Amino acid sequence: MSCILNIETSTSVCSVAASQDGQTIFVKEDLKGPSHAVSLGVFVDEALSFIDSHAIPLDAVAVSCGPGSYTGLRIGVSMAKGICYGRNIPLIGIPTLEVLSVPVLLYHDLPENALLCPMIDARRMEVYAAVYDRRLQ
């Protein structure tokens, strides 16, 4: 049984989730905006307390690695690195735009030649964007 702590801070949403064998067992989100420095520590503490209280060994930490808010990314990656260093577990970097494409692939029947173009607001009338095929290539 594998348990992964998931951290998302690349957008205006700050979220921490824990999953065990692909099933979500803990979720905390702040949808109000850029307060990651305040929310993340509390959310991670609650998630680790939940995991430890259920005697579930934490196997890895996954963190969004951008693109996205530079400050948000630094906060999330720093927290993830600290947890991994302290517990001697692997750190998994997850491309933010790739993750945004996954629900579309899972829940929609797309033609073989479909292209996906996830976007995140980069502010100042710009966006972070990528183009993926159905294999996320």
Predicted regions: what is each one?
Residues S12, G66-P67, A122-M125:
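Short glycine-rich anion-binding loops that position phosphate/pyrophosphate groups of nucleotides
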Residues M1-C65:
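N-terminal beta-alpha supersecondary unit
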Residues I4, D21-T24, D59, M79-I83, ...:
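Residue-level detection of beta-strand scaffold positions
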Residues Q23, K32-S35, P90-Q137:
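Surface "functional belts" at beta-alpha junctions
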Residues A62-T96:
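DPxDG-like acidic metal-binding loop motif
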Residues S49-L58, Y85-I94, D109-E112:
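Phosphate-handling active-site elements
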